[in-house]
Swiss-Prot record:
Gene3D superfamilies: Leucine-rich Repeat Variant. As part of AP-5, a probable fifth adaptor protein complex it may be involved in endosomal transport. According to PubMed:20613862 it is a putative helicase required for efficient homologous recombination DNA double-strand break repair. Keywords: Cytoplasm, DNA damage, DNA repair, Hereditary spastic paraplegia, Neurodegeneration, Nucleus, Protein transport, Transport. This is AP-5 complex subunit zeta-1. The keyword Signal does not apply. GO terms for biological process: autophagosome assembly; axon development; double-strand break repair via homologous recombination; endosomal transport; gene expression; Golgi organization; intracellular protein transport; late endosome to Golgi transport. It comes from Homo sapiens. The keyword Transport applies. It is linked to Spastic paraplegia 48, autosomal recessive: A form of spastic paraplegia, a neurodegenerative disorder characterized by a slow, gradual, progressive weakness and spasticity of the lower limbs. Rate of progression and the severity of symptoms are quite variable. Initial symptoms may include difficulty with balance, weakness and stiffness in the legs, muscle spasms, and dragging the toes when walking. In some forms of the disorder, bladder symptoms (such as incontinence) may appear, or the weakness and stiffness may spread to other parts of the body. It is found in: Cytoplasm; Nucleus. One of its GO terms (cellular component) is nuclear speck. Probably part of the adaptor protein complex 5 (AP-5) a tetramer composed of AP5B1, AP5M1, AP5S1 and AP5Z1. Interacts with ZFYVE26 and SPG11. Its main location: cytoplasm.
Length: 807
């Protein structure tokens, strides 16, 4: 969330029109052409970067301005801040045909890194990625003493390796592996020299001290990213940079492709998961560069795990410890996949690490890579995978649902490891109520992730309970908010809407009378039962205005679409019936968040039709329930889309064409129910409490009644009389208060068309209840048999008959 000032600046940047931007660019061009690039230039470039980065679409800059930005980026004496801004602006414009940066003419390593970042943002248009990679390698080979340091180039190299793994040749990969070994293992243990204090500084004050551990002890082992000091030397910075790119290098550096196992000199290990002999120290023999790098990477990760046991003196170091643990476990996982001998050597320390961090809420992010490691190597590692699953899915979502970063990483972990769940997929599926806590609290950023995950979560056994949970998701958001508000004060409370005051909701949350409903909503696993949460909807109505609840409500329609797309792949006939009944039953039992019901009803109406298409006999099998649903007009206008879909489905599928069990008695019952419903709809007058009924409801009701009459011809006189009344009613002035002029015209036209059809019952049945053959594409392509031809023929016959009648 941005502050009010930041939001205001972003809004202003987005509102700037192209003409204003053009004038501003002209001013920047004058500043960049001046000899002195002062504070005005810096301020203007900052504003330009904000303008072009604040919008989703690309802003077009004048070619003169782009050329000057590129020229400024290449100036040797240009201030670093200006060059960083020029590179950032050019990256925002990428990919662009107007960029023409020259990589070969850049000598300074800092400038090389900035130019490379722009070229890589361009994409691999003219093999820029390969050119950048080769340029970085030449700089690394030159061992240039001048310039800030080679450390500016390592992030570029890491990006090149990921974007184009085949860029490096074997000898180049070997060279960089050797350099990485040196940087990782042999960085200095002395701090960097301080800046000169001038004439009055003493030589003793300028002597560098040793680096320390995070707890203040003097470091006695090799330097790592967790070593502390006031100033770092260049080789220490290179150590940090090397570790940051280590995992990407191990995965992508081989010429044979990403993640390929290196089997050189390891034929004796083929077919073996663990090799005690290979796990012994390799110090006694000279290893090839790639294997030597793996050995050093393993030692580095082991040292990081040991350093993470130390009690950090500063909070920043404590956070760094956890971040380094995550990366160390990920690197160890790569090493064990590439060389199984590392698995035997890693297990003891990783099991100890898992036992230490599983009870520490502050280290919860470390559990995800640890769980991935144990699940990946579970059989060989002799780890109880079920225990790992249970702890992961039971405790973490309950305790950490309010952490946005962890929520994203947790759902990403579930998506990335679906292939590892295999026999434990039921554990994941049963844990969906806990996973939905992440979704309820972080719905905007997690919606797309859950849309991708839902197909794996949906199961025939829990589909109904999951649909209830999705419909109650905004209610869950409100309850999670209350849970945090009622918890004891914590040192780091998550953010909520402080402007919202809901004392009655807090009292209800603590009331033992409602504890059962609240506990059901907060359940950690699928219970196999469903609870009617309508009482909670009323109790929590004051929370409906909460911004987080509103955001969650906006995400539910998208999630419902994904759910139905998945459930229809696994649903049998019985489940389809239950889903249809659930749609009808929950249509008037939704949390009263603003605009929520309208969005949900739109999805439910389309999905009800999809279920009927999937199983046309649904209408006959659920005849009694559909009649009950249609028996009440209460809330019809608020559920107009769903009512329209139900009525249309009755007219389409209540026929012996789709189900031989359909009887004339059923058709008559539905006709009477729909006739009564149409009468009540047309008699209701809109008011503040009862909104205007859409004309689509009336036209679909008339069409369905006509369809039913064509299938039970005893009903034709009643249907004709009803349609005549509707046509007359549409002409009356009273209709103007109920429907707009366009709506009344639509009703009048539809009534006239249907009356015309009913004058020839056999043709009406042909048109309104076509056989399977008539529905085939031939009837819509062949001019001699097309349905429009049949309709035109009927119209002419009826007109001729009307002309012969005495006036």
């Amino acid at each position: 969330m941005f502050s009010a000032g930041a939001e205001s600046l972003l809004h202003q940047a987005r509102e700037i029109q192209d003409e204003e931007l053009k004038k501003f660019c002209s001013r920047i061009c004058k500043l960049l052409q001046a000899e002195d690039l002062g504070p005005d230039t810096l301020d203007s470039l900052q504003r330009l970067f904000l303008i072009i980065s604040a919008t989703k679409y690309s802003r077009r800059l004048e070619k003169t301005c782009v050329d000057l930005l590129q020229a400024t980026l290449g100036l040797p004496a240009c201030p670093e801040q200006l060059q960083v801004l020029c590179a950032a602006i050019l990256r925002e414009m990428s990919p662009s045909d107007s960029l023409s940066l020259a990589w070969d003419h850049t000598q300074n390593s800092r400038q090389l890194s900035l130019v490379a970042s722009v070229l890589l943002a361009q994409g691999d248009r003219n093999e820029e990625v390969r050119a950048v990679g080769q340029g970085v390698l030449r700089a690394l080979e030159s061992r240039q003493p001048e310039g800030p340091s080679l450390r500016h180039l390592l992030p570029v190299m890491a990006k090149v390796v990921v974007l184009s793994p085949g860029t490096l040749q074997e000898d180049q990969a070997t060279l960089l592996s050797k350099r990485l070994v040196d940087w990782l293992r042999y960085a200095s243990l002395q701090q960097g020299l301080p800046h000169s204090g001038g004439f009055f500084s003493t030589p003793r004050a300028r002597q560098p001290g040793p680096v320390t551990e995070v707890d203040g002890a003097v470091a006695t082992d090799f330097f790592t990213v967790l070593s502390s000091g006031h100033r770092f030397t260049d080789d220490q910075w290179l150590n940090v940079q090397a570790f940051s790119m280590l995992r990407a290098w191990l995965l992508h550096s081989g010429p044979e492709g990403p993640g390929t196992l290196d089997t050189d000199d390891r034929s004796e290990q083929e077919g073996s998961t663990l090799s005690v002999i290979s796990a012994t120290s390799s110090a006694g023999r000279l290893l090839p560069p790639r294997e030597r790098l793996r050995e050093v990477a393993f030692e580095y990760c082991q040292r990081l795990i040991e350093q993470s046991n130390r009690r950090a003196l500063r909070k920043g170091d404590s956070d760094l410890q956890k971040a380094c643990l995550v990366e160390a476990v990920l690197v160890l996982d790569v090493l064990c996949r590439q060389d199984p001998s590392f698995l035997y050597r890693s297990l003891s320390c990783l099991k100890a690490l898992h036992g230490r961090v599983r009870g520490d809420p502050a280290s919860v992010r470390v559990l995800l890579p640890l769980a991935h490691f144990f699940l990946s190597h579970g059989e060989a590692a002799a780890v109880d995978s079920e225990a790992v699953y249970q702890h992961l899915f039971t405790r973490i979502p309950v305790e950490q649902f309010h952490s946005p970063m962890l929520a994203f990483e947790f759902i990403q972990f579930c998506r990335d490891n679906l292939h590892l769940f295999s026999g434990h997929l039921s554990t994941l599926r049963l844990s969906f109520p806990n996973l939905f806590k992440f979704l309820a609290w972080n719905s905007p950023p997690l919606t797309s992730e859950f849309v991708a995950l839902l197909p794996a979560l949906v199961d025939a056994g829990t589909a109904l309970e999951m649909l209830h949970a999705l419909l109650d998701l905004p209610c869950l958001t409100a309850v999670l908010d209350l849970q945090l508000r009622s918890a004891p004060a914590a040192s780091e409370r998550p953010l909520w809407d402080t402007s919202l005051r809901a004392p009655s909701c807090l009292e209800a949350f603590r009331d033992p009378q409602f504890q059962g409903l609240f506990q059901y909503l907060l359940r950690p696993k699928a219970s196999g039962a469903t609870e009617r949460l309508a009482p909670l909807h009323q109790l929590l109505q004051p929370m409906a205005g909460c911004a987080r609840v509103a955001q969650c409500a906006q995400a539910v329609p998208t999630l419902l679409q994904a759910f139905f797309s998945a459930v229809t792949q696994v649903a049998d006939g019985s489940l389809i019936n239950q889903l249809a009944l659930l749609l009808l039953g929950r249509s008037d039992s939704l949390y009263p968040a603003p605009g929520y019901a309208a969005g949900v009803h739109s999805v439910l109406s389309s999905q009800f039709l999809a279920l009927c298409t999937l199983k046309p006999s649904l209408v006959v099998e659920l005849a009694r329930d559909l009649l009950e649903f249609l028996g009440s007009v209460n809330g019809l206008c608020s559920r107009a889309s769903l009512v329209t879909s139900v009525v249309w489905a009755i007219g389409e599928y209540l026929s012996v064409t789709y189900d031989r069990r359909c009887t004339v008695e059923q058709i008559n019952k539905f006709f009477e129910a729909l006739e009564a419903l149409l009468f009540e709809v047309t008699q209701c007058r809109p008011s503040a409490a009862l909104p205007r009924c859409p004309p689509q409801v009336v036209t679909v009701l008339m069409t369905t009644l006509t369809k039913l009459a064509s299938r039970s011809q005893d009903l034709i006189p009643r249907a004709s009389l009803l349609l005549s009344k509707m046509r007359t009613l549409a002409h009356s002035p009273a209709t103007s208060s109920t429907h707009s002029e366009e709506g009344a015209e639509a009703i009048r036209t539809r009534a006239t068309e249907l009356l015309t059809l009913l004058k020839m019952p056999s043709v009406a049945q042909f048109v309104l209840t076509p056989s399977t053959e008539v529905c085939s594409p031939r009837y819509h392509r062949d001019a001699n048999t097309a349905l429009p031809l049949a309709l035109r023929t009927v119209s002419r016959l009826v007109e001729r008959e009307a002309g012969l009648m005495p006036g």
